[in-house]
Amino acid sequence: MAKVDTTERLAELRKLMKERNVDIYMVPSEDSHQSEYIAPCDARRGSAGYAVITHDKAALATDGRYFNQAEKQLDGNWELLKQGIQDVPTIQDWTADQVEGGKVVAVDPSVVTAADARKLADKIKKKGGEYKAVDDNLVDKIWSDRPSRPHEKVIVQPIEFSGKSFEDKIEDLRKELEKKKSLGFVVSMLDEIAWLFNLRGSDIPYNPVFFSYAVVTPTTVTLYVDDHKLPEEVKKHLGDKVTIRPYNAIFEELTTLSKEAFTKDKADATSKFLTSSRASWALNKALGGEDRVEETRSPVGDAKAVKNEVELEGMRQCHLRDGAALSEYFAWLEDQLINKKAELDEVDGADKLEAIRKKHDKFMGLSFDTISSTGANAAVIHYKPEKGECAVIDAKAIYLCDSGAQYRDGTTDTTRTVHFTEPTEMEKKAYTLVLKGNMALERVKFPKGTTGFALDSLARQFLWAEGLDYRHGTGHGVGSFLNVHEGPIGIGTRVQYSEVSLAVGNVVSDEPGYYEDGKFGIRIENMIMVKEVETSHKFGDKPYLGFEHVTMTPHCRNLVDMSLLGEDEKQFINDYHKEVYEKTSGYFEDDALTLKWLKRETAPY
C-alpha cells in the first residue's frame, strides 16, 4: 500500500473554499443515503472515516479497523485521528477547535445526518464559529474525472426468496405509522428500499441495491427511481400500487408534500413525518425541519433484520454452497503451495476463490472485496490486495481469508485463518484463544431482551485473560441477498448495539480476532442465527434465546493448541466438523483432492 500524494487535490479544494468563503470543509465517507459501501461516483475519500480540511491543516479520523492502513497510505499533509484511543479528540471536537475567530465550517447536507448536523452546529456555535450547508459538493467540483452515477437495471426478488409480498410489508409499515399518528415515512436507506419492495439492483459494488428514495403515507406509495432502470417485469411487479417518480425529484416533492400536509385546515398539531435517524440533513430541511419531522430508528430496518422462515432457510442453503466453495479453495491453495511449489500472490488467491464460487447455483457476485492476506498483511483488518503491489502468499506464514458472496437466496461472510506449515507457539495460542471466544459466543443462552452489547465480552474473555484484545466489533447483522453489513443489530461496544435487543430471526456474524502489526493477524468468522432454545428454567417467565450456526467451513486444525481446549470445547468442534463433512462432502464426489482435504480437516480431535 503506497502513500497517496494529495498535495494538488488539497490545493484545488482550498482555492474553491476561499471562493465560497468557507474556512473549514468536512468530507464524510458516506453517500446521500448514508451507505457504508458507496458507488465510485461517491468515493470522495477512503473506506471509512471523516476528512476535515482547513486552509492550512487536514485531518482524517478513522476507527481501529483502519489505523494500520491509514498510516501506510496517508501522506505528510494529513493528521491521523485514531478514534477510540485515549486523549485523541473526536473529529467533531477537532473541527470545533479550529473555528476560533468566527470561522465558517461547511458540509454537503446530503451526506450528513440531520442529528449529526445539529450536534456539530451546536458545538461549533459554542466555540464562536458557524456551521452551514453548501448544497453542491465541493469535492465533486474539483473531481475532473468523477465517474457518472450508475444506471443499472433493477430486478425482482421473487417471493420464493423473499418469503413475503411487498404489499404485506407496506401494510406492516402503515400499522407502525398509525401507532405514531404519522403523516408518512421517508425511506432513504437503499437496502431498506430494496427489501421493502422486493427489488434488487447493482448500483453499488457488492451491494444489490439501486439509487432511490421512497415515501409511504397512509394512502400512497411513491418510489423515486429513474424510470429507465425499471424493466417491464419490475413495473408489472409494482403494478398500480406504486407511483414512480424521478430520483432527483425527491427534495422538491417532499417540500410540496410537507407544505400541503401542514396547511391550517389539514394539520394535526401532533402529526409529523417520520424519517430514519440516519436520514440526511438535506431530507430533513426539505420536509421543513424539526417542527415537521420526527427522527426514529427505521421501522423498515427493524423489520428487515428479522428474517422470515423462507429467508432463514435461504441463508442455510447458500452457506452450504459457499462452505463447499471455501473448502475447495483451501484444498487447492494448499496443494499449489505445498505440493506444486507454485508462486501465487494474494490477488491470485482471491480470483481463484471467486471463480470457484461462480460455479455454484444462484451465485450473483461477491458481497465485498475479498481480504486475501498473508503474513503481516493479515494484521491489516480491512486489507485489500492490489495486483502488482500485493504479497506472494507465503506457505510458512499465516494466511487470513475474509470473503463472502451474494446468492439469490442469501448473503455470506466467512473468515478462516490457516497455516500450511509450522506456526509459532504464539500464533497457535492466539488462534486458539480466538477460537474459544468464537465458540463461547455461539454456545451462549440468554434471556429475550439481551443486546449484542451485553454479549460482546463473551468473545473477548479468553484474550482479555491474557491481556490481549482486538479493535473491531465482534459481530454485525447480515442481509438476505442484501448488504453484508446490516443494522440495527450487532455485537460489540458501539452504543447502538445497546439499543436493540437480539430477536429470533436475526442473522449476525461471530468474528473475534487478534492482530500483531507487522507480524500476523487472526480472525475466525461464522454466521449465526438467533433462535429460541430450551432451558431448565425460565426466570421472569422470559423465553431464552441462543444461536444456530450456518457457516459450513472447517477450522484450521494445524493452528489449534489442544492443551488450551476443554473437553466440552473439543466435543463442540468435533460435532461441528462432523456436520460440515456430512452436509458438504457430497459436493466433492468428483473432486478427490478436496474430499481428502475435508476428511483430514474434519477428523475428530
Swiss-Prot record:
<comment type="function">
    <text>Catalyzes the removal of a penultimate prolyl residue from the N-termini of peptides.</text>
</comment>
<dbReference type="GO" id="GO:0005737">
    <property type="term" value="C:cytoplasm"/>
</dbReference>
<keyword id="KW-0479">Metal-binding</keyword>
<dbReference type="InterPro" id="IPR033740">
    <property type="entry name" value="Pept_M24B"/>
</dbReference>
<feature type="binding site">
    <location>
        <position position="402"/>
    </location>
    <ligand>
        <name>Mn(2+) 2</name>
    </ligand>
</feature>
<feature type="binding site">
    <location>
        <position position="511"/>
    </location>
    <ligand>
        <name>Mn(2+) 1</name>
    </ligand>
</feature>
<dbReference type="InterPro" id="IPR032416">
    <property type="entry name" value="Peptidase_M24_C"/>
</dbReference>
<dbReference type="Pfam" id="PF01321">
    <property type="entry name" value="Creatinase_N"/>
</dbReference>
<dbReference type="GO" id="GO:0070006">
    <property type="term" value="F:metalloaminopeptidase activity"/>
</dbReference>
<keyword id="KW-0464">Manganese</keyword>
<dbReference type="GO" id="GO:0046872">
    <property type="term" value="F:metal ion binding"/>
</dbReference>
<feature type="binding site">
    <location>
        <position position="413"/>
    </location>
    <ligand>
        <name>Mn(2+) 2</name>
    </ligand>
</feature>
<comment type="similarity">
    <text>Belongs to the peptidase M24B family.</text>
</comment>
<dbReference type="InterPro" id="IPR000994">
    <property type="entry name" value="Pept_M24"/>
</dbReference>
<dbReference type="InterPro" id="IPR001131">
    <property type="entry name" value="Peptidase_M24B_aminopep-P_CS"/>
</dbReference>
<protein>
    <recommendedName>
        <fullName>Probable Xaa-Pro aminopeptidase P</fullName>
        <ecNumber>3.4.11.9</ecNumber>
    </recommendedName>
</protein>
<dbReference type="GO" id="GO:0006508">
    <property type="term" value="P:proteolysis"/>
</dbReference>
<dbReference type="Pfam" id="PF00557">
    <property type="entry name" value="Peptidase_M24"/>
</dbReference>
<keyword id="KW-0645">Protease</keyword>
<feature type="binding site">
    <location>
        <position position="525"/>
    </location>
    <ligand>
        <name>Mn(2+) 2</name>
    </ligand>
</feature>
<feature type="binding site">
    <location>
        <position position="413"/>
    </location>
    <ligand>
        <name>Mn(2+) 1</name>
    </ligand>
</feature>
<keyword id="KW-0031">Aminopeptidase</keyword>
<dbReference type="Pfam" id="PF16188">
    <property type="entry name" value="Peptidase_M24_C"/>
</dbReference>
<keyword id="KW-0482">Metalloprotease</keyword>
<dbReference type="Pfam" id="PF16189">
    <property type="entry name" value="Creatinase_N_2"/>
</dbReference>
<feature type="binding site">
    <location>
        <position position="525"/>
    </location>
    <ligand>
        <name>Mn(2+) 1</name>
    </ligand>
</feature>
<dbReference type="InterPro" id="IPR036005">
    <property type="entry name" value="Creatinase/aminopeptidase-like"/>
</dbReference>
<keyword id="KW-0378">Hydrolase</keyword>
<dbReference type="InterPro" id="IPR000587">
    <property type="entry name" value="Creatinase_N"/>
</dbReference>
<dbReference type="InterPro" id="IPR029149">
    <property type="entry name" value="Creatin/AminoP/Spt16_N"/>
</dbReference>
<dbReference type="InterPro" id="IPR050422">
    <property type="entry name" value="X-Pro_aminopeptidase_P"/>
</dbReference>
